[in-house]
Amino acid sequence: MAILSNLEPKRVFEIFEEMCAIPHGSANTKAISDWCVAFGEKLGLEHYQDEANNVILIAPATPGYEDAPAVILQGHVDMVCEKEAGCAKDMDKEGLDLFVDGDLVGAKGTTLGGDDGIAVAMALAALEDTTVQHPRLEVVLTTDEEIGMLGAAVLDVTPLQGRTMLNIDSEEEGIFTVGCAGGGSVFCHLPLIREEFAGETLAVRVSGLVGGHSGVEINKGRANANVLMGRLLRAMAAVTELRLVSAEGGSKDNAIPTAAAAVVTVADGSAARKAAETLAAEMKKEYRIADPGLTVAVETVETKSLPMDEVTTGKALCMLTCLPNGVQAMSMDIPGLVQTSLNIGILKCGDDEMTAVCSVRSSVASQKQMVRDRLRCLTEQLGGRVDVIGDYPAWEYLPDSPLRERMIKVYREQYGKEPVVETIHAGLECGLLGEKLPGLDCVSFGPDLTDIHTPRERMHIASVQRTWKLLCEVLKRSK
């Protein structure tokens, strides 16, 4: 049964719902990519698909727009797959369970993928709708944006004529983004040596955190579960001999982790528990505003896994304690804008290696490199190694932008007020595509999406309606 079929704009929501029936998390984009190609083929459009599953669909200009310069509509097909504790949904294999609650669209127990499925839905609807007037329309749908903009990095832009681009990957209506931070993922690998150790084995769990986007919400003071876990383990090791067995937390480096778990073997279980309980009470006070749901649990468990030896445990706890996290510098040019940050988004443990994955962001290239150097220096001092993956450049503000001025004028007429024009502390593909398309004039915008990258994600229906109207009018005036 179609859940969104009664919503307007009808085709935008229908296409979005069709997308949601197809699993399309990052690194799982072949099916959704093929679906986009089939959509274009059905309309008889010029289309391209590459090995990274990027898709380009091109529609000719509508009558009267043949001499107007081409316009690019751009978004990404992958979504962040997060779900509530206890949710049985296999997001690699199953579609989403959508619901409508008043003016909101959500997915039961999981992320919705409005970031950036709504861009795909609007772009495809614009291609299909014969009442939408536009120049040559070049729809660029990239993959794996959420794990380092990997699709955009390898996109062949040869088919593209446009040097004006509407990126529909912003989550707050009325804000036009015209610049963003650069960034990338840093993988810090620590080799592990394991040996027998007699004692009581405990499971330590941190849960109930708010989490959120590691770029635009990094300055909200929210706790990082991996950082809290490092503090707890350090406190326990201070009162009794402790060996780390495993530590895990988070699943996306660009999402602030909401939970983490570790297994340790200790000489004195009672002392370890008391130390954890004492620190947990202090942490709850620290985060009573930002993370009122913070919970710490310690319980006895059994494990067949060997713990790490004393030296390795010390190195692992040092890494968890000393890895920088959060806001590192604020912009001196734009009040209130984060300039440099990082997020320890993923912590995972294998038999012979522990890995912490950090999302590093900065609008200043030299500061981005400085943070990477810190991570490399610390990790190598502990005997580990570092890999940098998915590097992307900052998107620099363009002083002279005809597209921005056109969008401001349309917005003013439709809304009766001025839009907010800003740069953001988050990564957008505009920087990468701007490098490939010299002279690219680009603005990022979109409807209201709240709590993206979390199961609380919601898309606002009325905002989608207004944003669609804005998009259609901007296309109409693109000549």
Predicted feature residues:
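Zn-dependent metallopeptidase/amidohydrolase metal-coordination segment
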Residues: 9-12, 332, 339-341, 345-352, ...
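Fold-level recognition of mixed alpha/beta catalytic cores in primary-metabolism enzymes, strongest
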Residues: 134-225, 233, 237
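A structural supersecondary motif
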Residues: 239-252, 332-348
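Acidic/His- and Gly-rich active-site-bordering loop/insert found
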Residues: 2-103
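Active-site metal-coordination/substrate-binding segment of hydrolases
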Residues: 65-163, 198-201, 310-314, 321-325, ...
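His/Asp/Glu-rich mid-to-C-terminal helical/loop segments that flank catalytic regions of hydrolases
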Residues: 222-239, 268-269, 315-321, 329, ...
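A short beta-alpha structural unit
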Residues: 17-21, 250-252, 261, 295-307, ...
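A conserved active-site cap/scaffold subdomain adjacent to cofactor or substrate pockets
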Residues: 253-330
